[in-house]
Amino acid sequence: MRVMWSAALMVAFGAGAADLTVMSTGAVKAAFTDASTQWSKESGNKVTATFDPAGPLRQKIASGMRGDIVIIPVDSFAALEKDGIIVPGSRRDLGAVSMGAAVKEGAPLPDISSVEALKGTLRNAKSVSYMDPERGSSGKYFDTVILPKLGMREEVRAKAKLGEGGSTAEKVASGEAEIAFQNVTELMNVKGARVVGLLPAELQSPIVYAGAVMKGAKHPAEAQRLLDYLASSQGRKVFLDRGFTAP
C-alpha cells in the first residue's frame, strides 16, 4: 500500500504543488495534523487547516466561508449535500471517537467504570467541565443524552464550567474544574491533565468524523487525494494512534 501511495503522490507532485485549505472540527486536530504533515512531505503540497467546535464551524459554512475540504461529524453531511456545499461522492469516513474524562495531573483518579460509579463521581465533584452544547458535538451529547440518562442534568448544570473551544482538559489543568468530559481525542496530551478513561459503554454513541471536498474548491483533485490518503491504511493508523477507532 505504501508503494502505491508513494507512486500516486509522485504523480500529484509532478502536477505542481497546491496549497489546500481545510475547515475542520477540533476533535481531529492532532490526528489530522500528523497525517496531513506526512502527506505534505510526500506530495509536496501544503495544507493549511483551521479548527473550530462543530457549532461555530457550521456557522462559518452557513455564512459562506469555504475551503478545499471540510471535516465534520457525519450527522452534518445530509445538510451539506442538500445545500450543495460538498462534492457528491467525495466523502471519506476518517474515524470514530468516544467520550472520556480527565482530571488534573496528580489528582486521584475517580471511578467512572460503571454508570453508578460515574453518578457518584459527578455527585461528589465540586465542578464539572464539558463543551458548551451550542458549540460542540461532545457537549451536546453529554448535556442532552448522558446527563438525562443519569438523571443528573440539572444537578451537573448547576456546577458546570462550559468549554468554548479547544480542550475541556485545560480547565482541570488550570484548576477551574475538578473533572472534564469530552471526546477522548481532545482530552489527550493536554499539559497538566490526565485522561481517566472512557465512559461506560452503555452511555457511548461514538461520533464518526468524515471529510469531503467542498464545491468551488481551488484544488479539488489534490483535496480528494488528501482525503483518500487519510482514509487509507497509512492515514487510518495515525488516527488509531491518536485515540480514534475505525469508523
Where do the PLM segments sit?
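Sec-dependent signal peptide recognition
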Residues: M1-A8
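Hydrophobic h-region of N-terminal signal peptides that target proteins for export
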Residues: A8-A17
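Exported/periplasmic ABC-transporter solute-binding proteins
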Residues: A17-G55, Q59-S63, I71-G84, S90-V97, ...
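Periplasmic binding protein-like
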Residues: D68
